[in-house]
Amino acid sequence: MRKPFYKILYVQVLFAICIGILLGHFWPDTGVAMKPLGDGFIKLIKMIIGPIIFCTVVTGIAGMSDMKKVGRVGGKALLYFEVVSTFALLIGLGAAHLLKPGVGFNIDPATLDTKAIAQYVSKAHGQSTVEFLMHIIPDTVFSAFANGDILQILLVSLFFGAALAVLGERARIVVQLIEQVSKVFFHIVHVITKVAPIGAFGAMAFTIGKYGLGSLVPLLKLIGTFYFTAIVFVLVVLGTIARMTGFSIVRFIAYIKEELLIVLGTSSSEAALPHMMEKLEKLGCSKSVVGLVVPTGYSFNLDGTNIYMTMAVIFIAQATGIELTLMQQLTILAVAMITSKGASGVTGSGFITLAATLAVVPTIPVAGMVLILGIDRFMSECRALTNIIGNGVATVVVSAWERELDRKRLARVLQHGAGDDADTLGEAGQRAA
């Protein structure tokens, strides 16, 4: 029996976003006061991300007969991430040169007040490659979960799952226990998801109330250029990759519409991570690939953030009248390829990553970030949407490379829209096992 339209989650979230926009615009003070609703929802999701990643990765790896497969899946995922991320950086750079969103501002960097961006610049210091890699290793097993660091949790999960796989039948009872615990946490996800409209309403009301629609006007060309470029990237680059893998990017986007609306409302791709992992399993991807690729992608495969970084750098250069040589632009690309790996799927991380990039590229003044601070929240929504679509496509592609993609199920789900709330994770788990 079909649900009434007003009971469908994505309809509720879309309605909540619209109400949030209206409240924030006409009653900004009240809109700003709604911030705890959005923050509370994101904290609820973050509360269970660690256990879900742990359970999914551990049960997936423990079920592998060949431990070499873990390294093979990880290697293929990182190769894909690097190639597609480089494409995203180049496309952002090219679009900024082609559409020139910063030309005509003629701003003297010395006149800019950098107090507003001081907190971002301070957070960006010290993000070297070595420190980033060392940070992946937690101080203790429990500190990884206490800090909620996705990569640290993933590392612990990899070791734990590999140990269970080596122990084999002797650890079977532990694997079965973790599988049952996983079902409990995914049930919690479904409960939390029911309040997603409230979270989306609060986050959107705060964004519009604090920054106002009027803050968009002076920089509409930059916003339009970024959104247009992101759409082209998704439809052309990711669309081509999807078509080569055997599915339609448009149908895939329609399939994850609920997750996209949650991301749109909260500006955080992390808010949809647990539900996204579940959806990808239902789509036909194996549990082991989903568990490895999705969490890793939240630091290594942020396509929207990559497009934003190179575009923002060129925008600041254009707005301040700085001419960049080819070598300087190649340097920016090289630096961005490293600093982008330190980003995560949370609100504002893209701006911090931009600060880290500019901090090691002295040609362009860090003070120029002031120009886009007011609109970053609106850019964050597009970054997060592009990121989550990119990670979803990456998971399907790696599953196909590993021959662990149920293509019949993939075609059936995308064709008929199966796998929504009526499906259960248990069914997906039985198929993956």
From Swiss-Prot:
Gene: dctA
InterPro entries with a match to the protein in the record: C4_dicarb_transport (IPR023954), Na-dicarboxylate_symporter (IPR001991), Na-dicarboxylate_symporter_CS (IPR018107), Na:dicarbo_symporter_sf (IPR036458)
Membrane spanning residue stretches: 8-28, 44-64, 78-98, 148-168, 188-208, 222-242, 307-327, 355-375
Localisation per UniProt entry: Cell inner membrane
This protein's record includes keyword Cell inner membrane: yes
Keywords: Cell inner membrane, Cell membrane, Membrane, Symport, Transmembrane, Transmembrane helix, Transport
GO terms under cellular component: plasma membrane
Entry-linked Pfam families: SDF
Family as reported in the entry's similarity comment: Belongs to the dicarboxylate/amino acid:cation symporter (DAACS) (TC 2.A.23) family.
Organism field: Cupriavidus taiwanensis (strain DSM 17343 / BCRC 17206 / CCUG 44338 / CIP 107171 / LMG 19424 / R1) (Ralstonia taiwanensis (strain LMG 19424))
Keyword RNA-binding included in the entry's annotation: no
UniProt superkingdom: Bacteria
Function field: Responsible for the transport of dicarboxylates such as succinate, fumarate, and malate from the periplasm across the membrane.
Gene Ontology terms: biological process: L-aspartate transmembrane transport
Protein name (Swiss-Prot/TrEMBL): C4-dicarboxylate transport protein
Membrane-topology descriptor: Multi-pass membrane protein
HAMAP family, A to Z: C4_dicarb_transport
Example of a GO MF term: malate:proton symporter activity
